[in-house]
Amino acid sequence: MNDFITETWLRANHTLSEGSEIHLPADARLTPSARELLESRRLRIKFLDPQGRLFVDDDEQQPQPVHGLTSSDTHPQACCELCRQPVVKKPDTLTHLTADKMVAKSDPRLGFRAALDSAIALTVWLQIELAEPWQPWLFDIRSRLGNIMRADAIDEPLAAQSIVGLNEDELHRLSHQPLRYLDHDHLVPEASHGRDAALLNLLRTKVRETETLAAQVFITRSFEVLRPDILQALNRLSSTVYVMMILSVAKHPLTVAQIQQRLGEKP
C-alpha cells in the first residue's frame, strides 16, 4: 500500500476503540487527520511488513523493528529467577517470564499466561467462525487480551480500554441488568440458543478460567491484590462475552448505539 491512509479509511476498517492496538502495512503513510485520530484514541500503532515483522515509528518517524508483544527493540540478558545468574544456554525446563527473567515451567504464573494464550486463540478462532456483526466485539476482545498479556509480561499498569465504545462500568451494568438494557433476561446456556451462543459461551468460560488462574497468582494468602487492573479487566471481559450471548438470543438485538442510548437514560 503506497497510498495515504485517511481518517475515513481508518474508521471503515478498524473499530478504533480507545487503548487498542492496530497493525498497518509497513509502507503505509498517514494523513495528518488520520494520525491525529489515532493519537486522540491512544491507539498503539504497529506496521507489518510482508515477512511478518513488526515496526514502530521513532520520534523521527523512522521505522524500528520491535518485539510483537512487548514493542521492545532490545534483547536484555535473561537471568534465572532462583539463582540470579545469567542463563547462557536455556534448558527445556526454563522459559521467559519477562525479557530479563527466566523461571521454571512449573511456575503458576506460566499457567495463568497459558490460559490467557488459549483465550486469545479461541477469540481468533471465533473471528473466523462468527458473522460480521460480532467482528468489532471480537476485535476489541482480542486486543484487550493482548494488552493484558503485554502488561503482565513487561510488568506495567494496564491502561483503560473500551469494547465497541463501551467502558468497563457500562459493560458491568449491562451484564447485571440485561432485561433493562438489552430486552432479554439472564440466561443459562442450552442447545436451543443456537450456534453463536454456544461458541460465545466457550469463550466466556475460557475467560472465566483465566480470571480464576490470575486470582491464584495475583491474590496473596493475606488477600493482598497484586494486579487489580488485570483481575478487573478479565472480569469485565467475561461480562462482555455474556452480553454478546444475550444479544445473540434476543428476538430483536439492539445495536451498540441503541445500547449506549439506554445506558444514558435516567432510571
UniProtKB/Swiss-Prot annotation:
Q: Superkingdom, according to UniProt?
A: Bacteria
Q: Catalytic activity annotated for this protein?
A: 2 cob(II)alamin + reduced [electron-transfer flavoprotein] + 2 ATP + 2 H2O = 2 adenosylcob(III)alamin + oxidized [electron-transfer flavoprotein] + 2 phosphate + 2 diphosphate + 3 H(+); 2 cob(II)inamide + reduced [electron-transfer flavoprotein] + 2 ATP + 2 H2O = 2 adenosylcob(III)inamide + oxidized [electron-transfer flavoprotein] + 2 phosphate + 2 diphosphate + 3 H(+)
The protein's predominant localisation is other
The pathway this protein participates in, as annotated, is:
Amine and polyamine degradation; ethanolamine degradation
Q: What is its EC number?
A: 2.5.1.154
What happens on changing residue 67 to A? Reduces metal content of enzyme, does not complement deletion. No binding of Co(2+)
Compartments, as annotated in UniProt: Bacterial microcompartment
Disrupted gene: resulting phenotype?
Answer: A quadruple eutP-eutQ-eutT-eutD deletion is not impaired for aerobic growth on ethanolamine (EA) supplemented with cobalamin (vitamin B12). Can grow on EA as sole carbon source when AdoB12 is supplied; double cobA-eutT mutants do not grow with CN-B12 as a nitrogen source. A non-polar deletion mutant grows on EA from pH 5.5 to pH 8.0, but does not grow at pH 8.5, no change in acetaldehyde release on EA plus vitamin B12.
An example GO BP is: ethanolamine catabolic process
Q: Where does a divalent metal cation bind?
A: 80, 83
Q: What pH-related activity note exists for this entry? A: Optimum pH is 7.0.
Q: What induces it?
A: Part of the 17-gene eut operon transcribed from a single promoter, induced by ethanolamine and adenosylcobalamin (AdoCbl, vitamin B12).
- Could you confirm whether the keyword Ligase appears in this record? no
Annotated effect of mutating residue 75 to A? No effect in vivo or in vitro. No binding of Co(2+)
Q: Does the keyword Nucleotide-binding apply?
A: yes
What does UniProt give as GO cellular component? bacterial microcompartment
Cofactor binding notes: Binds 1 divalent metal cation ion per homodimer with both subunits providing Cys ligands; Fe(2+) gives most activity and is possibly the physiological cofactor, followed by Zn(2+) and Co(2+). Activity stimulated by Mn(2+).
Molecular function (GO) terms listed? Answer: ATP binding; corrinoid adenosyltransferase activity; metal ion binding
Keywords attached to this Swiss-Prot or TrEMBL record, sorted alphabetically, are: ATP-binding, Bacterial microcompartment, Iron, Metal-binding, Nucleotide-binding, Transferase
Cofactors named for this entry: a divalent metal cation
Q: What is the annotated role of this protein in its UniProt record?
A: Converts cyanocobalamin (CN-B12) to adenosylcobalamin (AdoCbl), the inducer of the eut operon. Is not active on cobinamide nor other intermediates in the adenosylcobalamin synthetic pathway. Allows full induction of the eut operon. Can use ADP, CTP and dATP in place of ATP, and cobinamide in place of cobalamin, none are as efficiently used as ATP and cobalamin.
Q: How does it assemble?
A: Homodimer.
UniProt lists the family membership as follows: Belongs to the Cob(I)alamin adenosyltransferase family. EutT subfamily.
- Stated name of the protein: Corrinoid adenosyltransferase EutT
Q: Which organism is it from?
A: Salmonella typhimurium (strain LT2 / SGSC1412 / ATCC 700720)
**Gene name on record?**
eutT
